[in-house]
Amino acid sequence: MRTIAILAAILLVALQAQAESLQERADEATTQKQSGEDNQDLAISFAGNGLSALRTSGSQARATCYCRTGRCATRESLSGVCEISGRLYRLCCR
């Protein structure tokens, strides 16, 4: 009888751990979905050769930057941070 109670307790703990893992994944998926929406909130374009971070040899540089909550996209590089409504985001430029 004692063995059955111990096995039942172990089973309940395992099920609870699995449920927490599923909840974490669901929360993470929701966060990623929301950050995907946030990624397109602000686009900044720079043109000209006066910006030292965007200088090229003798030609006008052009960059498009996005304030992102997650990682920068494939062809973008991290160029700093930006602040919107008191929240900090990554400034990703290409």
From Swiss-Prot:
Changing residue 88 to A: Reduced interaction with B.antracis lef/lethal factor. Reduced enhancement of S.flexneri infection. Changing residue 77 to A: Increased interaction with B.antracis lef/lethal factor. Changing residue 69 to R: Enhanced antibacterial activity against both E.coli and S.aureus. Enhanced membrane binding and membrane disintegration abilities, as well as further increased antibacterial activity. Expressed in the gastrointestinal, reproductive, and urinary tracts (at protein level). Expressed in Paneth cells of the small intestine (at protein level). Expressed throughout the urothelium of the lower urinary tract and in the collecting tubules of the kidney (at protein level). Expressed in stratified squamous epithelial cells of the female genital tract epithelia, such as in vagina, ectocervix, endocervix, endometrium, and fallopian tube (at protein level). Changing residue 86 to R: Enhanced antibacterial activity against both E.coli and S.aureus. Residues 1-19 form the signal peptide. Changing residue 75 to K: Does not impair antimicrobial activity against E.coli, E.aerogenes, S.aureus and B.cereus. Reduced induction of IL-8 secretion. It is found in: Secreted; Cytoplasmic vesicle, Secretory vesicle. Disulfide bonds join 65-93, 67-82, 72-92. It comes from the Eukaryota. Changing residue 94 to K: Does not impair antimicrobial activity against E.coli, E.aerogenes, S.aureus and B.cereus. Reduced induction of IL-8 secretion. One of its GO terms (molecular function) is protein homodimerization activity. Changing residue 90 to K: Impairs antimicrobial activity against S. aureus. Reduced induction of IL-8 secretion. One of its GO terms (cellular component) is extracellular space. Host-defense peptide that maintains sterility in the urogenital system. Has antimicrobial activity against a wide range of bacteria, including Gram-negative E.coli, P.aeruginosa and S.typhimurium, and Gram-positive E.aerogenes, S.aureus, B.cereus, E.faecium and L.monocytogenes. Confers resistance to intestinal infection by S.typhimurium. Exhibits antimicrobial activity against enteric commensal bacteria such as B.adolescentis, L.acidophilus, B.breve, L.fermentum, B.longum and S.thermophilus. Binds to bacterial membranes and causes membrane disintegration. Belongs to the alpha-defensin family. Homodimer. Homotetramer. Interacts with B.antracis lef/lethal factor. This is Defensin alpha 5.
